[in-house]
Structures are given as C-alpha cells and as structure tokens.
Amino acid sequence: MEKLNEIVSAVDGFVWGPVMLVLLVGTGIFLTIRTGFLPWRNLGYALKSTLSKEARTKSRGTGDVSPFSALTTALAATIGTGNIVGVATAMVSGGPGALVWMWISAAFGLTSKFSECMLAIKYREVNAKGEMSGGPMYTMKKAFKHKKFGAVLGWLFALFAVIASFGIGNMTQANSISESLSSTFSVPTYVTGIILTVFALLIIVGGIKTISKVSSVVVPLMAIFYVIAGLIVIIVNIQNLPAGVVMIFKMAFSVKAVGGGLCGTITVAMMNAMRFGVARGVFSNEAGMGSAAITAAAATTDNPVRQGYINMTGTFWDTIVVCTITGLCIASSGVLGITENSTKGSYQVSGTAVTVEAVDSDNKTTTTDYTYEFTDDQLILTDTSNSSNTLTLSVLPSDELNKDENTKLASELAVEESQAAIGSLTGTWTDAAGNHYTFAEDGTFACSTVIKGAALTILSFGSALGKVGGWFVTIGIVLFAFSTILGWEYHGEKAFEYLFKSHKYNMIYRIGFSLVVYVGATISLDLVWNFSDIANALMAIPNLICLLALSGEIAKDMKEFQAVIKAEKASK
C-alpha cells in the first residue's frame, strides 16, 4: 500500500505540475484576450445581475432552478476547505506572495468560468424526467464538428467527474469535517460520520431542487459570517496590515525573498509563490475545471450569456473575497512562519556521522543515522540508509531564535534554541519550509514544524477572537465542507447520468454517494486525496480543449450580448 501511495503521489505531482497550471491559467489568458476583456469590463454588470431580484426568480426563460440558486449551488461546491486550509497552505509553502498569484489566476479564471458555464447552458438537454442536463460533456458531444472525438472527450470528462465527486467532493470533505470536530470539540469520528450521512441523505435524495434550496440559504450566510469575523480580525490587527500587504506584494515578485519579523521565517522564490498561489487558487475556484458548468446548466434563463456572467461571479466571491479575507487575517496577525514543537529526542556525534533518536507527538521513536557536511552557507544531512533522503539546512537568523516561546506556542519539552554557525552542528537550523532543527550542547534534539493549514487560520482568528476564533474557523470548515459535498453530488450525478445515458439510476448514485460520506469521515485518506487530485486534473484536460476549440464561438456570443447589456442599462 505504501508503494502504491508513492506511485499515485508521483503521478499526482506530475499531472498538477507546471504544465497543468500553465494550461489552466494560459487558457484563461487566451480567452480573456480573445473576448476583448469583456468579462473584466462587465464584472460590475455581472455582480449587479447576481444580486438582482430577477436572479432569485424563475420568471425569465426555462430551467430547473433560479439563476441565483444555480450560482449558490456551484459556490457550495467551490467554497470549501480550500478557502480556509488551502490559502494557509499556499502562504506557508509559497510565501505570503502566493496570495497575489491566487488573485491573478482568479482574474483570468473569470473568463474560463464564464465560458464553460455559458456553453453548458447553450448545449444542455432535457432528460426524460423533464430536468435539465448539461455540462462540458454535453458541449463536447454536440458542439464539436468531429462528433466521435467530442463524444470520447465528453465520456472521459464524465468518468473523471464521477471519480472526483467521490474523492475531493465527498470523502476528503467529510474527513476534514471529522478531523476538525475531533481536534476542537473531541467529537468521535464515527459520530460525525453518522450525523453527516443522515443530513446528506435527507438533502441529496431530494435532488437539485432541495440541494439548491439549502445552498441558496447556507452558502450566502456562511460566507457573510466568515467575512465579518475575518474583518474583525483584520481590524483588531490593523496596525500590522500595511506591513503585511507590503510583504505580500514584495514576496510575490521577488527573485528570492526572505520574510522575517511579521511574516516569520518563510524563505521562498517568486516561482514558488506563483506555483502554490496558482495551484491553490485553481483548487479553490475550479475555474477551467468544468465542474461549475454542470450546475449552471440547471439555471432558468433566457440567454446562455446572461447566466454565464452570473456564474462567472463565483470565482470573484470565492477567491477575490473569501480567500482574500483568510490571507489578510494570516498576514496581519503575525502568525505566518510560527512553529510548534512536534519532535524531541537526542543525538550523538561520531566523526562526520550523527545518530538522531526522535520521539514524535504520538510517542513513536525513530532512530536515523546521518552523515553531515558543511558547504559555504549550509548544513547537509544525508540518511545513510537512503541517500535520497537529504536535509539541507541553513543557519536560523538570530532575530528568529525562540520566537515560539514569545508566542507561548512551545511545549514544555522544547529545547532552547541557540545560534548556529557553519562548522559546528550545535545550534538551531532551518530548512526551506521554515522548520527549526535544534542540536543542543547537552545532546538533546528538537524539531519544530511550521504551523500550516487549518491550524494556521485558527491561530490568526485566535489572535483577535481568542478561543472563540478557533471555534469559528472549525464551524466554518464544517459548513464549507458540507456544502461542497452537496454541490459535488449534483456534479457527479449528472456525469453519472451521462455515462449511463439515463436518469433511472440517479437515486442509486444519490444513496451511494451519501453512504460514502461515512467512509470519508472515519478513515485515513492520503491515497484518496491523491487519486481525486489526479481525477480533477484529468477532468480539466478535455474541458480546456473544449474551451480553446470553441473560443471563437464564445467571443462571438459574448460580443453579440453587448447590445442587450447596453439596452438594459439605458432602460434603467
């Protein structure tokens, strides 16, 4: 199983490597230019349309749900743990500048989201039950001149969408909920699993109309409360905000930037900020993935372009608003780069070899033999049993020593950090991720890891709201993740319907999907995460081919709709 996990992890790293990120953002850039930047120019119109009374009714055109409900159901699937965990992870792995690259990817992602949603409505069908069925798979099947090629692409998209729905849209979300409730409120995972499964069944069995009703209430409310709480954190830490914002932009474009003081000990290059910012941004808003288009196809509308604009705002609300709130909370609270002591133990030196006996937080002891050598400015530790396992460490700046004690995060077992120097193993060192390694003079050893993910966001909210901040983030994760489960169920169901060319099996999918929620809440999911990441990437490839192939049609329809926009503005 471990070998399988390594293989899947390697494949995941490849498919989500630079090529995929360039394709996703590059397609957005190409479409934005091809459409004459109309998505940017008409963003105000799109936001106004989204918040209008007409968007909440089914009075204009045909469809299953209101335009606003179609948007909120799509947002239910995209506003998830990525907005809380993903942003924090990006800012640790890629530095504070990753937030800027999330904004950049979202700016061009607006056009990708518009395009896939507009096409989904234009080429949707009415199934035997009288319900709308649409999405990239229908677009590929009906719009491509080479019908066989389009049919194959559509089938592949639907297959990977079903796989992704059970992975990143279900089990991983349920797992995030159960872990959060377990760590914050000590709720047993099986209890969380049972409750989630029951609620999922009650809502999902009702289909898109029930899901959209719940989403149209829960999604706006949870987003509003999260934004308000985030603004409180930012206001309380307002004195740090200017420096935090400067650091965000400085580290986004520096060839090599080092963050100290406010933003901790994160050391990154511009490419790192770009890589993690774009990747987390895409995971958060799913622009170019094609998933949101499946929900958009259910909207009641008289013009595909009109609904395309409404669904396009999902990327704005998701990344430009919610992710930005999380990022500014982290930047202004001074928690980025803070570490916690996760490993203690001892070490023994023999010539150029050192044996480290480490005890982790679960009291598991690991003994590793290393050889060590010094370069001009680094300490290199190489595992004697696995030469590919190498640690490259640098001297920890003196102003970062014992920073954890100042923030009262260090455990009682912490080893006092001391200044290291090239030529001597003794002292405190740091790796590229900001983790601290301390070899004390008395032979004791400690490793302090950088806090990231949900824990980092909880710390940032706690800086202003205390323990309540942690509760708030946990509740946010629960609501965001559960809404993602609901939204992705509909995505997967419609893809499932496409594969079997019938709606007759939809109820089987709904029940099966709901029961899998329990599995996700109660088991370890490293392998599932990687599998679902791969499925997500493989969904994106046929969708991007579709968007590029139909770019001329997208631009034509969009430009023709300009007359409608002008007429509507003139009449008001």
What do the PLM-derived regions correspond to, one by one?
Residues 3-4, 34-39, 82-87, 165-178, ...:
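Transmembrane helix-loop junctions in multi-pass membrane proteins
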Residues 23-30, 35-47, 157, 174-181, ...:
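Membrane-interface loop-to-helix entry segments
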Residues 340-442:
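Lipid interaction determinants
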Residues 37-65, 89, 94-99, 103, ...:
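Flexible loop linkers connecting adjacent transmembrane helices
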Residues 57-92, 119-143, 159-162, 263-316:
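Alpha-helical membrane segments and immediately flanking helix-loop junctions
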